[in-house]
Structure formats: C-alpha cells, structure tokens
Amino acid sequence: MVSETVEANGPLYPDYLPFYDPLEKVEMVGPFEHDDPGHRADPSFPNLLEKATNVLELSPHCGTELQGVQISELSTQGLDELALMVAERGCLVFRDQDFTNLGFEKQKEIASHFGPLHKHGWMPHPKNGPEEFVIVYDSKDDLRIRKSWARKSPIQFHVDQSPESQPPGATFFCMLESPPGAGGDTVISNMARAFDRLSPSFRKRLEGLKAVHTTANPIMREIRDNGPDSVLRRPITRTIHPVVVVHPVTKRKALFVNSSYTQSIVGWDEEESDYMLKFLFDHINRGHDFCCRVRYEPGTVVIWDQRVTQHSQTLDYSAGSRRHAFRLTPLANVPIPSLIEEDDGECAKDEGRMLLNLC
C-alpha cells in the first residue's frame, strides 16, 4: 500500500522496495496438477465485461485494454474468464487499479487463482513481504537492473523462468510508479502468431523438436555484475521443453524458445542448433506485426499468458528516473508438445503464399 509517511521525492511504496540477501535460499514449487481456470470460463465473458466501459484492441494479434474493470472486484467466474481472454489475446491491460493497494496477501490470493506462485532464484522481493513477489526497481539509488542490461539494446524477448518444469501461465505485472512523461514500456509478442507466420513445411520441421532451457547464463550474469552481493537462492535449473507447444485451453500452437533461457536443440550438433535458434530468435525480434506495446501509468496492471507470448522491457527513459513495479508469476501446466499434422489446407487459403508458389 501507499505509505502514509512518504519522504520527499522518495518511493510511494516503500513496503515494496527490493531486498537483496546473498545468503537467502528458497524452495522450488514441486510437481502439481494444473487445473486451468480458462477451461471453466464462459466464452462470451459476461462477468469480465459486465463493467467494462470500453474494450480497446492494442493490435490485431495481441493485446486488449479493458477500461472500467477492477480486477479486485471480479468474481471467481470473472477470473476464469480473464484466464480465457488472456489466453486468446496474449495480454490484457487494466488501468487505475486498486490492486496496487490491496496488500501482499490479497494480491497473492488473486494471482494464485491461476496457479501456485513462483519464487525467483535471484531477483529481489520486498524485505518484509512474501518471497513470491518479484520487485522491479530502477532509480538513482538502485541501478542494479540498469547495470544488468549494459548492452547496446536491452530488448530481449523472453518467457520468465521457462526452465521451470512447469513454466508460468497468466502473469501479473503491476506498475507502482512509472517514469515521468513516457518510457519504460513493455513490448509483448504473440508466439502463436509467430508460429503461424512460418511456412507450413517449416512449421512441420519444428514440430517434434525439443530444446534445453537453463538459468545458467542469467545466474552467471548475476555473479558477474554483483560479485559477493550476488543473490543465488536456487541452483541452476535445466529442463527440456518442446520447441512448439499447444495451449491447453485454446489449442493454439506457439513457439516456445527464447533467447534468455533456450540453450540448444536436443539431438542437433552445436552449429546446427545455433543456426536454427538464431533464425527463430531473429524471427521473434523482428515480428513487430504480431506485437503490442504497453505504456504504463501508476496503477496499471498488465496480465500476459507466457505460454503464448514473450515480452521485453524497454530502457528508453533517463537513468535515475524511478520505475517501480512488482510481478506475481503463477506457474501452469507441463508444456504440451505439438504433434506433426498432415496438410490442413490452410496454406492454400493464403493468397500471398499461393501467388509465390510456396504451397
């Protein structure tokens, strides 16, 4: 909640300031049965849309802003419908939310409707708050995030913690304070659309492949950047997932490789694997026509489904400007592999591909 004793020019939410403890350890969430709430949802979204004053599509293939809806007021049925809509649209944006002021336990309760909450291996949580919270804090007195992106560009599309055996599903990102003016947006990309944009024969080549996902590189960066102050709550995680997955509710196929965590394709030589992954990463990075860009203001809550999207921060605001947010990351199902199918005739319906003799 907003502190009643905010220092001049200090953070509005001091209870959500980041806490770094190099000695802290956390337990990983064990295997669990995931009952996706989207399965229970009414596809006409009566409970979710009941109070919506406006529904704005951010782009044709990704992102919807629901104006006038308070997440905190949604019934169980409304949260189920939220799960279905975010699976279909990739991400949902809610403005002017009282969610920011509900307190740790109520925030956890709402997010836990979508699955057990992940505990991060190196990013901070609040000092006196639950370990499930991930604090994103960039300001003149804490440049740790900015230092970790000391490259030409911070743009890096990824799935949060894809090396988990059951990676995240619907994920909550809540903006407490945003840079003045503009900047610090999140770009979200639809991986189902990214897969659809590939040629039919190439899609079939990807189906059935598996890839290694690991936290090794991010953990090595944490050690490089922060030395003895590094936070290493969990050992390196390594998991094998399908390259193409199927969403359990919508049944849409989506690419499931990302440049932060995907290391190699199983069974391929290093050169072959690197070549293929570079193509897929480039395809994702260049796919501006299946992305949306979310601009923040205090009280904005964005929910995206990480089984069908990837996202990237932008670091285009001035160093020293405060950007303060938290993330709650419900885990979901074991990734479902896509099965190779016979020609479904979809290519023949694409006039552009037919004209180029690509079918």
From Swiss-Prot:
2-oxoglutarate binds at T186, R323, R327. This is Alpha-ketoglutarate-dependent dioxygenase cnsM. Substrate binds at H120, R327. It holds the Pfam family TauD. Its EC number is 1.14.11.-. Keywords: Dioxygenase, Iron, Metal-binding, Oxidoreductase. It is an enzyme of class 1 (oxidoreductase). Belongs to the TfdA dioxygenase family. InterPro entries: AtsK-like, TauD-like_sf, TauD/TfdA-like. One of its GO terms (cellular component) is cytoplasm. One of its GO terms (molecular function) is 2-oxoglutarate-dependent dioxygenase activity. It comes from Penicillium expansum. The keyword Transport does not apply. Fe cation binds at H158, D160, H311. Its cofactor is Fe(2+). Alpha-ketoglutarate-dependent dioxygenase; part of the gene cluster that mediates the biosynthesis of communesins, a prominent class of indole alkaloids with great potential as pharmaceuticals. Communesins are biosynthesized by the coupling of tryptamine and aurantioclavine, two building blocks derived from L-tryptophan. Binds 1 Fe(2+) ion per subunit. Pathway: Alkaloid biosynthesis.
